[in-house]
Amino acid sequence: MTTTTTKFRDVEIRAPRGTELTAKSWLTEAPLRMLMNNLDPDVAENPKELVVYGGIGRAARNWECFDKIVDTLKNLETDETLLVQSGKPVGVFKTHKDAPRVLIANSNLVPHWANWEHFNELDAKALAMYGQMTAGSWIYIGSQGIVQGTYETFVEAGRQHYNGDLKGRWVLTAGLGGMGGAQPLAATLAGACSLNIECQQASIDFRLRTRYVDEQATDLDDALARIDRYTKEGKAISIALHGNAAEILPELVRRGVRPDMVTDQTSAHDPLNGYLPVGWTWEEYRERAKTEPEAVVKAAKQSMAKHVQAMLDFQKMGVPTFDYGNNIRQMAKEEGVANAFDFPGFVPAYIRPLFCRGIGPFRWAALSGDPEDIYKTDAKVKELIPDDEHLHHWLDMARERISFQGLPARICWVGLGLRAKLGLAFNEMVRSGELSAPIVIGRDHLDSGSVASPNRETEAMQDGSDAVSDWPLLNALLNTAGGATWVSLHHGGGVGMGFSQHSGVVIVCDGTDEAAARIARVLTNDPATGVMRHADAGYEIAINCAKEQGLHLPMITQ
């Protein structure tokens, strides 16, 4: 079938606010608003090209598909389900009222063909779309979506390496895109200074405007002078520096500069679209990507090799160094850096004990558009979890420092048991009128039971099951059976084609009894799959959690 395929449109998209429906129910209004919110200019990295974040992570395959998704959601009945294939609406089928209203599959390829070369061929023919994680699953909330995970990582690194105190210390990193843009604020909240290298001035401007980064240095000498001053004063200030990390990190090594922590969150997962080769302008990079993609990929990976070698050099100095999930080690290894994996990924180094208890990036958004609805839910979280000072501290910092992007939203790492408790409470707040409109609850695909990614979330599993991807498939199937409002199954998010499979879930709190039943099922089952997955791998923390929570795991708890 021949269709027009427009990827650029000079238009501004914003989700509707308030209580007036544009669809037939809140269960279809919610995905409609969250799709549009993904493309809000205050949220998305390049909304006019449908790019939400992460290189080319899109919300819809092209503008014609976007228009048709919007039209279909507005007219979808309460017992119908829309199927979306790589950003294209392909079918509406009769299901039932407790079934998902939308089922999404993005970027999935048969394993032998699961590489960037084949994907890019399909993308050029308008046959596929890269959905990243929350771009194509319509639950991206801006950089806040990863702030707490990054904060938890920095805090745990501080506990392990610096006796829990990052005051007077600094983090060296790069990348200020939709994901990397969380790093400077997360470091500040954790008590550390940070130097954040970014090759696009527009991305720096975005983070300055949204208060995720505090200030910009004029050059490297100025940046180091600021770092020296602020660390001596014990101030946690974030500094952006315009430049190329593959040039600046080796220069810092040459100078003998010693940060207190080194990581990276450039879009290294996508060498064709997300990592600027040394000596190139961004305009040259984008133009040559169209005409000589193989040469561009080669040049980008050569620069990544220099970047990773510098990170290895910092590690040799004794600096805690870790990968933050962008697959840069893999790219460098393919370019000849044989020991690229000598420094660990952040999940096995700092986060896995949380995953073993089903704890991960629980998030919610206020469909009303009213920030007061989020502040009321913040208070409810504190009320229902009264003894978690760390969580209360996070919520206080988030309210003070995090600017809402698009529809007001909050992220809060909680696990099995508490997710359902909070979801049911939010639903009751909608029912009682305490909240002015329904709430949507979702999460990142980066969660305990929803992803297989051997170079990131499932790196170094103790039983060697890093690459087993049955788990995210089971997670998606169970959330569908449980009655989530929309469920997604993606490939390649975070680390690129061939390196991950993962699933997403969103559920609407509309204040009804039917919603309460769905919430209780979905928000219990979803984190429980994470406990199950880690218990199956032999982690004692997960096994104990499964027993404490009464999970029925036939080979473990029975």
Swiss-Prot record:
Its cofactor is NAD(+). GO terms for cellular component: cytoplasm. InterPro entries: Urocanase, Urocanase-like, Urocanase_C, Urocanase_central_sf, Urocanase_CS, Urocanase_N, Urocanase_Rossmann-like, Urocanase_sf. Gene3D superfamilies: Urocanase like domains, Urocanase superfamily. PROSITE patterns: UROCANASE (PS01233). GO terms for molecular function: urocanate hydratase activity. One of its GO terms (biological process) is L-histidine catabolic process to glutamate and formate. The keyword Cytoplasm applies. It is an enzyme of class 4 (lyase). It is found in: Cytoplasm. It catalyses: 4-imidazolone-5-propanoate = trans-urocanate + H2O. Pathway: Amino-acid degradation; L-histidine degradation into L-glutamate; N-formimidoyl-L-glutamate from L-histidine: step 2/3. NAD(+) binds at residues 54-55, 132, 178-180, 198, 244-245, 265-269, 275-276, 324, 494. Binds 1 NAD(+) per subunit. It comes from the Bacteria. Its EC number is 4.2.1.49. Keywords: Cytoplasm, Histidine metabolism, Lyase, NAD. The active site is at 412. Catalyzes the conversion of urocanate to 4-imidazolone-5-propionate. HAMAP family: HutU. Belongs to the urocanase family. This is Urocanate hydratase. The lineage of its organism: Bacteria, Pseudomonadati, Pseudomonadota, Gammaproteobacteria, Moraxellales.
